[in-house]
Amino acid sequence: MNTAGEGVAQDIIGATKTFCKEHAWVDASKIGCIGASYGGFMTQYLQTVTDIFAAAISHAGISDHTSYWGEGYWGYSYSEVSMANSYPWTDKHLYVEQSPLFNAEKIHTPLLFLHGTDDTNVPVGESIQMFTALKLLGRETAMVLVDGQNHHILEYQKRKQWQNTIFAWFAKWLKGDDTWWKALYDKMPDKKKQSSQVI
């Protein structure tokens, strides 16, 4: 509590490094990072504090605690649970300094954003604003929005596309094979443009 991402990030980084060290068959230069909801936030946050991951995927993650506060299904009550009664006006360290958006310039890991357009838990703007920041910074990033889906991707065909998108992104950045990604998104604008798509 009252650490937002710091404490959890230290645990994940330490565990990942230890696992790689203890398993010689693991290529430590090709580790992927993925998370959804709070895990999506953690995925974004981790990329601001470490470079151990070769690619990352955030599904429905919070990028800015200050903008998320008061929004969505949870709204201000989120701080009652995860922030231990801290608020934007009482704890800048939690709400600003540990929000990925305010540290976007520190991210160099290729980062994919996935989000349902009808998410009532974490508004889709949380992914859009972080994606926009990384595009402005010239980072490797992409965003795929799943039309008509909420916090969870439940429609069968769209879930298949969502899962294939995950596998294709990791194949591109962890295996050096962008064939699958191109097959799914060959019409996606190049990296100098928006690089986002709705499925």
Tell me the role of every PLM-derived stretch.
Residues M1-I199:
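Active-site-proximal cap/loop segments of hydrolase catalytic domains
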